[in-house]
Amino acid sequence: MSIVNSVRAQIPPIHREGYPFVGGFALVTLILFWIWSPLGWIGTVLTIWCAYFFRNPARTTPVRDGLVVSPADGRVSMVVDIIPPPELGLGAKPLPRVSIFMSVFNCHVNRSPVAGRIERIVYSPGKFINAELDKASEDNERNSMVLSTEHGQIGVIQIAGLIARRIVSFVREGQPLVAGERFGLIRFGSRLDVYLPEGTKPLVAEGQTAIAGETILADLKGGDAGRIYRTD
């Protein structure tokens, strides 16, 4: 029994958004096995990949006041100062922005970068160009959220990409979130932008690998006081 529990501990659960996809792949796989077994094995591989894509692992989040953690797994594709999109309502001055690109191999469950209350959620229809391009932040379909914290407002934008055609949000305006709490998901490759308060110095660099709920993007308080961690 201990061996079984050990194996289970190493396999993350599937997010509920993935149930229809994994179930569909599994059904097709059974049909393929009935038609011709080699096709069934191909279907098995695709079913396992689909389950892997929708994995929903626990993460250990540092929850000290002022820390901003990554909202997504992926690669830090841009760290720039840029004027935020108007739908965020964060003004017309350039703000620090950290962009994280998620490939189809990354976990796509998105987590709140800070503890705060959701002031605004705005959905914007748009195109589906390559999410790595800078103009994707303005041209692509996206879901924008503003979080109010003791240290200012944080903007978080889920951006669809070439393959990602479905942005899912689990939250509503006025809802409080804790750092690292799951708030959404984007299917099959995309990007997350985080807008930080003016004067904030990002602690990550372009090309760095980020882990949702764990990698620290910035420290709004400065310094490096002791941290407390929460696993979820």
UniProtKB/Swiss-Prot annotation:
A GO molecular-function descriptor: phosphatidylserine decarboxylase activity
Residues at the active site: S190 (schiff-base intermediate with substrate)
Primary location class: membrane
One Pfam match: PS_Dcarbxylase
Enzymatic class: lyase
Pyruvic acid (Ser) found at: S190
Domain of life assignment: Bacteria
The record's account of how the chain is modified after translation: Is synthesized initially as an inactive proenzyme. Formation of the active enzyme involves a self-maturation process in which the active site pyruvoyl group is generated from an internal serine residue via an autocatalytic post-translational modification. Two non-identical subunits are generated from the proenzyme in this reaction, and the pyruvate is formed at the N-terminus of the alpha chain, which is derived from the carboxyl end of the proenzyme.
Site residues by UniProt (Cleavage (non-hydrolytic)): G189, S190
Co-factor note (free text): Binds 1 pyruvoyl group covalently per subunit.
Catalytic activity: a 1,2-diacyl-sn-glycero-3-phospho-L-serine + H(+) = a 1,2-diacyl-sn-glycero-3-phosphoethanolamine + CO2
Compartments, as annotated in UniProt: Cell membrane
Subunit relationships: Heterodimer of a large membrane-associated beta subunit and a small pyruvoyl-containing alpha subunit.
HAMAP family reported in the protein's UniProt record: PS_decarb_PSD_A
NCBIfam families: PRK05305.1-1, PRK05305.1-2, PRK05305.1-3, PRK05305.2-5
Function, in words: Catalyzes the formation of phosphatidylethanolamine (PtdEtn) from phosphatidylserine (PtdSer).
Protein name, as recorded: Phosphatidylserine decarboxylase proenzyme
Organism: Rhodopseudomonas palustris (strain TIE-1)
Name of the gene this protein is made from: psd
